[in-house]
Curated annotation (Swiss-Prot):
Enzyme class, spelled out: transferase
InterPro entries: Lgt (IPR001640)
Protein name (record): Phosphatidylglycerol--prolipoprotein diacylglyceryl transferase
Protein family (similarity comment): Belongs to the Lgt family.
TM region(s), chain numbering: 21-41, 54-74, 93-113, 122-142, 173-193, 203-223, 236-256
Lineage of origin: Bacteria, Bacillati, Bacillota, Clostridia, Eubacteriales
EC number: 2.5.1.145
Pathway: Protein modification; lipoprotein biosynthesis (diacylglyceryl transfer)
Length: 268
């Protein structure tokens, strides 16, 4: 469905080659994450030079996990009928829950091989992820996807003109859920950045990321129109978000009870 008639999802057209805004935004988010990851790694007593080699493993694993999750968990009825679309990731369809799973598996294999501390690096990744997600959600805006149910009149009146026009589908203004999640991710990043600067115990930042992001995702998912369902009316993304948020709470309690490591603040 054409969501933004006034925005072309293709940024640059060179002959048969189309460079889409979605791809530009995702690549920009990844590049910023790698750069910031080096700075945050140094703060945690890690080698910033390791970030590049880690990213070479983590980024493809995350993208692969995001795509596999989108195709085989969320949208298999569609892709089973359109197998030619499976590899067309530039058209959208990268699920963050799959990216986290794919990245976690790759990190769990790669970091011990390089004798690197898993949870310290998890904190670095957990810190940059919400910022990358906040940026990446604007790829949904340009790619004309991830909008919600019809918005109430009071909200429509508060929307700036460009957003109201962009969210109008068949004469009805829809919830800009991509924007809600982008803002929530920015708030999550801000909270985690404060925790990072306070040198909280190893594992706390990543655990809080799981809790905060997934709590917001659980709420926002309830009004999205592109949700996938299982067992009748249970939204897959909400179920996964609930499980990951609970996992985050368990990990958070565990890390807070552990003795502080070198480089942690002993008081938190």
């Amino acid at each position: 469905m054409q969501l933004l008639a006034f925005v072309d999802p293709v940024a640059i057209q060179i002959g048969p080659l189309s460079i889409r805004w979605y791809g530009i935004i995702i690549v920009s988010a990844i590049a910023l994450s790698i750069w910031l990851g080096g700075r945050f790694a140094r703060d945690r007593g890690l080698d910033p030079a390791f970030v590049d080699s880690f990213a070479i493993i983590l980024v493809p694993a995350g993208i692969l996990g995001a795509r596999l999750y989108e195709v085989f968990v969320l949208q298999w009825p569609y892709y089973s009928q359109h197998p030619d679309k499976i590899l067309q990731i530039w058209e959208g369809g990268l699920a963050i829950h799959g990216a986290v799973l794919g990245g976690a598996i790759a990190a769990a294999i790669y970091l011990p091989m390089r004798k690197q501390p898993f949870w310290r690096w998890a904190d670095v990744v957990g810190l940059v992820l919400p910022l990358a997600q906040a940026i990446g959600r604007w790829g949904n805006f340009f790619n004309q996807e991830a909008y919600g149910d019809p918005a109430p009149d009071w909200l429509v009146r508060l929307m700036p003109g460009w957003l109201r026009e962009g969210m109008t589908i068949s004469g009805t203004v829809m919830h800009p859920t991509f924007l809600y999640e982008s803002v929530w991710n920015l708030l999550t990043f801000g909270i985690l950045l404060v925790c990072h600067r306070r040198r909280m115990k190893t594992g706390v930042v990543f655990s809080l990321y799981l809790v905060l992001y997934n709590a917001g995702r659980f709420l926002i998912e309830s009004i999205r129109q592109d949700s996938s369902f299982i067992f009748g009316r249970i939204r897959v993304a909400q179920l996964v978000a609930a499980v990951l948020a609970i996992l985050g709470l368990v990990l958070l309690a565990w890390f807070l009870r552990r003795p502080a490591e070198s480089g942690d603040s002993a008081g938190v």
